Every structure is written in structure tokens, then in C-alpha cells.
């Protein structure tokens, strides 16, 4: 049996910050000052991502992974961030977990991430899928497939 190409390949990609946008208003651009609030397992990686995107993280509040983000904490941190000339930012994961409570704080920004894959690694990811789809299409076009399906 032929080993699928993707099981042998080591694909390297980078998670990057694509945008930092409040619920109400325009996106923030570097070098905007941010107060990072997160309830994720890797808050250091979040900070590095923001800094690599050119943002200035002036302060951060780290909660435990999956820990709820109470409204009173958001209100307090918004005031503290404002006093420092900064904006409060959360991850997409935390924004999702905050649910409808987030709508109460339209000035909270959400950092949206994107996966950066170079052309070589994109081919490692998608060429096998293209090959598999092509084989499936050819199979269903041939007479053997019609006999198999009937």
C-alpha cells in the first residue's frame, strides 16, 4: 500500500495576528497600545503574536485556560487600559466564550488570527488532497465505478 504523502510530510506554518478590531469601530493598527486579557493556555504566545504584529502590550491579565471572564473584570480592565492610553484586547476564543456578554462592551477589541503557510508547505497540505479528489473523480467516471455502484 502506498503511504499517503501527507503522513510523511512535516508541514510548518505560523499563527499570526490578522487584525485587532473592536466590536464597534475601526480596526486598531500598530503601534496601538493594548492591554491583553486572556483565558487561554498560552498567554505568552498571544503576547508574542501581538508584539510581532507591531502592537505594544502595556499590560496583561492572564486567567486560567477556559476560566470565565466576568463582566466586572472587563469593566475594571477597560478603565485601567483607558488610563494608560491603551485598548483592551481578547482572543477570538475568549470573545466566543464571552458570548452575548461581549456585546455589552463594544470597545473591547478581538484579535483575529490567521494561519500563515508558505507556498511549499501549502503544496504539502493541498497537493495530496487534489490528487485524492482527482482519483475519486476518475474512479466515478470509469465503467468499473458504474458496475461497483449498481
Predicted segments — roles?
Residues 1-150:
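ATP-dependent carboxylate-amine ligase
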Amino acid at each position: 500500500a502506498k503511504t499517503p504523502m501527507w503522513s510523511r510530510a512535516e508541514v510548518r506554518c505560523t499563527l499570526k495576528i490578522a487584525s485587532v478590531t473592536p466590536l464597534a469601530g475601526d480596526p486598531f493598527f500598530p503601534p496601538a497600545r493594548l492591554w491583553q486579557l486572556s483565558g487561554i493556555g498560552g498567554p505568552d504566545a498571544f503576547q508574542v503574536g501581538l508584539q510581532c504584529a507591531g502592537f505594544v502590550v502595556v499590560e496583561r491579565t492572564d486567567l486560567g485556560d477556559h476560566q470565565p471572564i466576568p463582566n466586572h473584570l472587563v469593566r475594571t480592565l477597560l478603565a485601567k487600559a483607558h488610563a494608560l492610553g491603551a485598548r483592551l484586547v481578547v482572543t477570538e476564543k475568549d470573545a466566543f466564550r464571552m458570548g452575548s456578554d461581549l456585546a455589552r462592551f463594544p470597545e473591547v477589541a478581538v484579535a483575529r488570527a490567521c494561519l500563515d503557510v508558505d507556498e511549499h508547505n501549502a503544496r504539502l497540505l493541498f497537493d495530496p488532497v487534489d490528487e485524492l479528489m482527482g482519483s475519486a473523480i476518475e474512479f466515478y467516471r470509469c465503467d468499473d465505478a458504474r458496475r461497483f455502484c449498481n
